[in-house]
């Protein structure tokens, strides 16, 4: 009987060993198969939200609608927001002396890589006209800070030092005012103001500025009222050239509401929301409401275009872009503030490879993701407008095979300890 029991134990043990061997072989085969499949799969950058960046602001400060972000050559992160103007009464009781919290932070904030607040400034001052509704921020190769504005009378841009010293105003506030003018049907068109897309001096509610170091030229996404890209001398502010969609002469004739079934509009919709230059000196223009990205030479010659989430209506899908930090800038990262995602795009083909994010309030989710920027390590920074009112950092985690079109919310992996 003992021998029978022992034999059964030996058989059982051998079976377990055989099973483990089979499982090991199967696992090895699966791993090799997956590796082979991944080897031929499309690769894309992978990200993970950093829920602890930045650090809390001092003085009970909070952010309003946050509508611009840029990373300077020191890897410092700059944002611009609308502060008190976009805070509800229950959010700013410190200002109204009705409670201890909170107050709107100054409009322009600078953070280091650890999330510490380094500098803060902005607002009305002598010698310049602060925008009614500031919009977009850029730090140029000389360390100067550029901002635009999309308030009703904002037809100018401003340049400051990093410490907030005023340097230059281009354009005159209120230049687009025309008594009796009716409101248009697109975002930014307000009664009493008309477009001036062929104006050689002033703008029409500028969304964003990009400065080309090689030519010392500023590219202006102009804008929420005008329908053009304007290029100016970055020192004098003199406008040198401008163009509309497809390189056409800009035309301020109101467009019908965007309809994806209609032929492509031959002018930009409002707003023209970005105009950024790549390393090979191509200008990528965000036609936000038109759901399209158009590409031009620096002289305004049309090169190509692509649509994204083409059936997106209202505020559109193409809000802002940033280029990857490899030498060829292989990828474009695009903020989509209606569908609440960041798109990862092959820059050469303009093909969308994958997306991450979703609507919501938790880390890694978005509410009105508006602007996007990248640091030297490849980390992404996004800001949110409307009631989003925040900046988020997404850490670059290397390249990975694309296994699905939408990665969802890219939270950090939970610890197994």
Language model regions located:
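N-terminal secretory signal peptides that target proteins for export/translocation
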Residues: 1-7
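Eukaryotic scaffold repeat domains enriched in small/polar residues
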Residues: 7-417
């Amino acid at each position: 009987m003992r021998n029978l029991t022992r034999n059964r134990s030996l058989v059982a043990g051998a079976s377990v060993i055989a099973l483990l061997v089979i499982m090991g072989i199967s696992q090895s085969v699966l791993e090799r198969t997956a590796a082979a499949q991944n080897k031929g799969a499309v690769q894309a950058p992978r990200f993970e939200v950093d829920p602890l960046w930045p650090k809390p602001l001092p003085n009970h400060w909070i952010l309003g609608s946050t509508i611009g972000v840029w990373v300077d050559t020191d890897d410092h992160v700059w944002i611009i927001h609308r502060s008190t103007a976009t805070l509800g009464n229950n959010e700013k009781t410190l200002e109204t002396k009705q409670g201890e919290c909170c107050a709107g932070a100054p409009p322009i904030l600078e953070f280091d890589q650890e999330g510490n607040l380094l500098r803060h400034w902005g607002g009305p001052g002598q010698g310049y006209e602060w925008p009614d509704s500031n919009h977009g921020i850029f730090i140029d190769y000389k360390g100067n800070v550029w901002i635009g504005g999309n308030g009703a009378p904002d037809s100018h841009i401003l340049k400051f030092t990093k410490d907030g010293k005023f340097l230059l105003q281009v354009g005159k506030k209120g230049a687009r005012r025309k008594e009796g003018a009716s409101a248009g049907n697109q975002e930014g068109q307000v009664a009493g103001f008309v477009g001036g897309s062929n104006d050689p001096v002033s703008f029409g509610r500028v969304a964003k500025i990009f400065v080309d170091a090689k030519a010392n030229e500023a590219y202006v996404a102009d804008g929420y009222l005008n329908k053009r890209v304007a290029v100016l001398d970055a020192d004098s502010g003199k406008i040198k050239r401008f163009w509309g969609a497809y390189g056409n002469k800009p035309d301020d004739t109101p467009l019908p509401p965007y309809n994806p079934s209609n032929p492509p509009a031959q002018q930009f919709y409002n707003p023209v929301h970005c105009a950024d230059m790549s390393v090979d000196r191509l200008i990528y223009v965000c036609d936000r409401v038109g759901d399209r990205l158009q590409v031009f030479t620096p002289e305004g010659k049309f090169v190509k275009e692509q649509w994204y989430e083409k059936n997106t209506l209202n505020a559109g899908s193409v809000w802002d872009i940033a280029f990857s930090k490899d030498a060829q800038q292989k990828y474009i990262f695009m903020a989509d503030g209606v569908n609440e995602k960041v798109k990862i795009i092959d820059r050469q083909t303009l093909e969308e490879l994958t997306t991450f994010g979703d609507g919501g309030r938790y880390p890694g989710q978005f509410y009105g993701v508006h602007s996007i920027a990248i640091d030297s390590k490849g980390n992404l920074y996004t800001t949110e407008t409307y009631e989003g009112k925040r900046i988020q950092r997404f850490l670059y985690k290397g390249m990975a095979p694309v296994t699905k079109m939408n990665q969802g919310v890219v939270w950090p992996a939970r610890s197994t300890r």
